[in-house]
Amino acid sequence: MQEFEFAVPAPSRVSPDLARARARHLDWVHAMDLVRGEEARRRYEFSCVADIGAYGYPHATGADLDLCVDVLGWTFLFDDQFDAGDGRERDALAVCAELTDLLWKGTAATAASPPIVVAFSDCWERMRAGMSDAWRRRTVHEWVDYLAGWPTKLADRAHGAVLDPAAHLRARHRTICCRPLFALAERVGGYEVPRRAWHSSRLDGMRFTTSDAVIGMNELHSFEKDRAQGHANLVLSLVHHGGLTGPEAVTRVCDLVQGSIESFLRLRSGLPELGRALGVEGAVLDRYADALSAFCRGYHDWGRGASRYTTRDHPGDLGLENLVARSSG
């Protein structure tokens, strides 16, 4: 996998509690029946996907870090249920509906619920603990929008057309899961962005540009893997629709990432004015901006050496086991 480096405006940091959290997380995925057989466990440990929790939330320790690594691990396991290619797509779509009900209606996982639903319920109970109703409502919306992106992904895949770059990015903004993970930063940071500021176009733009940067890095990291498996990727879209060579398309995505980072910094420079206009304390806005930067830096640092994106026999794939089928017991 080719390495890429970008000027992310945050220092490289990793939670000092990573080793303990990683060991405890492996026990959690086993207890949740998310990783069963020996090969699945080997692949999961090899992928190091949950480590993003320690990279993206470097100040988190203890139970807060446990929540971060569990949520991140869950997102990758959920993602790969849609790439298994063994006919489980119908069950995966049903899981999206069940999780949406769990979030919107407050329904609980049942004894028949698939392991991926039970695990999410466990994460969501911890994630929302101690947070305001306003935070819960907006975070539910972010999770539901993420879940709604997966039926679109399956429909586009069944159609077989290569999406143009703009359409590809729109779809990826939903399934990349950045926005729920930004809400997680507030939860483990012990603060909430005031409603008036959170809904401002400036902060929304900062979330968007951070997501754009993470998406671009993800497309670069996963390009070789996606090409080998015949999956959609922004680089391939640029080649198909833009008439670019592979190297030219890679350069274009690199430019997208760096441009998104620069746009983020321009938006951040206006936070003092926003705080004064809305009567919001500048410190909380800076803290939120720092959290977005830290997540972007954490993904950047983790992704550069992630075993997740190797191509040889696809050892980073986590879809070996069906986690979306309902229990027959």
UniProtKB/Swiss-Prot annotation:
InterPro entries (UniProt xref): Isoprenoid_synthase_dom_sf (IPR008949), Terpene_cyclase-like_2 (IPR034686)
Enzyme class: lyase
Binding site for substrate: 172, 225, 308-309
Cofactor detail note: Binds 3 Mg(2+) ions per subunit.
EC number: 4.2.3.26
Gene Ontology molecular function: any one: R-linalool synthase activity
Protein origin, superkingdom: Bacteria
Entry binding sites for Mg(2+) 3: 218, 222, 226
Motif DDXXD motif, chain ranges: 79-83
Cofactors that this protein relies on: Mg(2+)
Protein name: R-linalool synthase
Source species taxonomy: Bacteria, Bacillati, Actinomycetota, Actinomycetes, Kitasatosporales
